[in-house]
Amino acid sequence: IEFWRGVPLITVLFMSAVMFPMFLPADFFIDKLVRCIIAISLFEAAYVAEVIRGGLQALPRGQYEAAKSLGMGYWRMHIFVILPQALKLVIPGIANTFLALVKDTPLIFVVGLLEIVGMLNLAKTNPEWLGFAMEGYVFAAIIFWIICYAMSKYSYNLEQKYKTER
């Protein structure tokens, strides 16, 4: 986990897109999109794991002891007592991590894959679209804002539904 958290996402994407194929056998091929999805997944999983670890550490020791006193085994204790409480506590942190993931998607343009900002950069070089770059950027900003606002409102609603304050 510390490795993935200690390396910038742009470096992880560059390594997955450019360096990783150099270490594969010549007849073995993994598409660049798949490599980037795996790299982003590993990167974001490290951050989500840290958020969940924080939630687990925030629970009082008494919760563990109470579950053990009821005769629950390790897995049963975690599935039915500990994780539901910890996940309820970390809703804001997980939502923040997913919002950061959405905001990090334009970085895949650096390794040659296109997303909304990458397509905009490609379109503004087209002679038919000269002079319309500002409108494209405004449109992209509105799309990102709508997605992030919707995710933020959903997170807020989850917090209210489950009363995540301590």
Which residues does each PLM region occupy?
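Transmembrane alpha-helices and adjacent helix-loop boundaries
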Residues: 1-166
